[in-house]
Amino acid sequence: MRRFCRLLFLNSLLSISICKAQNPAHLVADEFKEHFNVEEKQLETVEELLLKMKKLAHSRSFAGREFGHDAVEDSKKEVAISTQQGTIDKKVSPFLFEGDIFLSRRQAVDILKALSKDKTKRLRRSFVSDKTATWKSLPIKYRFHESIDFYTISQIIAAIRFWEDSTCITFENVSDAPVGDYIEFFSGQGCYSMIGRNGGRQGISIGESCVKMGVIEHEIGHALGLWHEQSRPDALGYVSIERDFILPSYISDFLQRDDEIDTLGIPYDLGSVMHYGSTAFSVDQKSKTVVTRDSLYQQTIGQREKLSFYDVATINTAYCKEECKSEKTECEYGGYMRPSKCSECLCPDGLGGEKCEKNEDAKNAECGGILELSDEWKTIESPNYPDPGYEADQKCSWLLKAPKGKRVEIEFIEDFSFLCTSTCVDFVELKISDDLRNTGFRFCCYDKPEISFVSQIDTAIVIFRSQLSADIGFKIQVRSTESEPRTTIAPTIITTTMAPITVDTPNVWADWGEWSMCSRTCGGCGIRSRVRSCRSKKCEGRRQEFGTCNLKACPVDKHCAKLLSNNRLCNGKVCTKNDIAISSCDAPQCCPPFVNVDGMCQSDQENHHDELWLSI
């Protein structure tokens, strides 16, 4: 069997090494059977149920049209649920619901039954309502399949760390397949996962186009029990579905459901990492299929940077009610005690400090702050506005406070320019509703917002974020006002409060256990882990740590080839250039960022061997 290695250089900064076995005869069904606790017959049943679902939804929406013809035509086109997430692989598409969900047989049957009925009553029921689908014991065990490369592993661990830091959910990496329930990360044909715990081996596919923290957090969110945000029964109060622009055979992927989904009292969040993008399943990948009721939210939906505050709150409400019970909640602006560390507040985006009382600390820039407003205008601008402008990977936030009884007025002035994408990646965000926990309006591209914004309460938050590019940025002026607020959709207030945990004894950790076996035999991209147990009721710190291992360079493989790809943005605009070169693997190989030095894999980054995994 021939092998190939792929080495990608992204934005001249990140390198990814991918080695796989090529086998043209490989059946897509084998991917599901290998990584999920499913047999051939079950897989066929799920495929049949999904097809019935598609046909039924198609007949109701497009009476008189032939489903078979539409399905054939649609299969020729690329589809995705968000421009920030990879396209859906056509080979796995027949087995997936809503683009990236592999349903259990029971879930598929329940959804088809609900679709077959004429339901007129909608219950306020984004979380799986089946209580058996929650993970009963922690930590959740997981392992990496050999198809996962070194860089992807690091991104998966970073995503897991984000979940662990923000919730009471804990994970444990294991080298071999354990007995019982566990997650197996593998490099499959696209990005997909199951909803909730399904028993035994449960895969999460992180394909080549999925190696982004927000996408990985999204797929882990499915495994914990999160459905897509726009599937909630209350979704049509916030978005409308434009059927004329949806690929007809995919209309079943736009259902709002009540029986399978429980909102847990969490407000609808247009900035959820679980939300479809505006061109999901679009006929031409440009026409909008999901349109926000408030047009100012249009470029907010579909983000895949990270979990939103309410994404995390949903899981904390479902799993962590017993945490932090004895702690007095002193967090401001809707923050609450962090379940993973009850002495800290978990703050809404844009806020920070011990009690969420101040703006969030800046990232890679000197900016942000707290502004006490008066009737006089004050100005705020992005870093280095307007020239040379902001740089990639910066963040700033400003907490704006008007006198009691007044509101905050915001106007954009002078030049305005950001990287232009259908879902804003670089943006300025205004949080001006009476719920500062929810995501606000995000603005990008080149057209300066011309209207004057007025907050609903005496406080507002402005957030600047750049992920990919450099550009001019924004400048605004702010002041206090007695004007009426700009009308917008009022988010529902959370009805389920976080139950604040008793820590009766100080941290008492046991000694670290033995290191696990290395996941690779050579090349420096292997990892090993070890765990320790908490001997007191509550411990702070990591219960598992990771290290690199087997740093000897891999032997020469004459059948191996490298694909070098260089992708970069130019001048901060939408401009991408791809350069490809082929070369043979004629020397012992190391996984990036390691290089072969006298037969050993060493990093060109100082202390990289020792610190990479321990710092994740």
Curated annotation (Swiss-Prot):
Residues that bind Zn(2+): 218, 222, 228
Cofactor note (record): Binds 1 zinc ion per subunit.
Signal sequence interval, chain numbering: 1-21
GO biological process: molting cycle, collagen and cuticulin-based cuticle; proteolysis
Molecular functions per Gene Ontology: metalloendopeptidase activity; zinc ion binding
Cellular compartments annotated: Secreted
Active site: 219
Domain EGF-like: residue ranges: 316-357
GO cellular component, one term: extracellular region
Residues bearing attached sugar chains per UniProt: 173
Pfam families the record matches: Astacin (PF01400), CUB (PF00431), TSP_1 (PF00090)
Domain CUB: from-to ranges: 367-481
Required co-factors: Zn(2+)
Matches recorded under InterPro entries: Astacin-like_dom, CUB_dom, MetalloPept_cat_dom_sf, Metallopeptidase_nem, Peptidase_M12A, Peptidase_Metallo, Sperma_CUB_dom_sf, TSP1_rpt
Occurrences of domain TSP type-1 (ranges): 506-555
Protein purpose: Mtalloprotease. Involved in molting, a process during larval stages in which a new cuticle is formed and the old cuticle is shed.
PANTHER family: DISCOIDIN, CUB, EGF, LAMININ , AND ZINC METALLOPROTEASE DOMAIN CONTAINING, ZINC METALLOPROTEINASE NAS-36
Protein's recorded name: Zinc metalloproteinase nas-36
Source species: Caenorhabditis briggsae
The gene coding this protein: nas-36
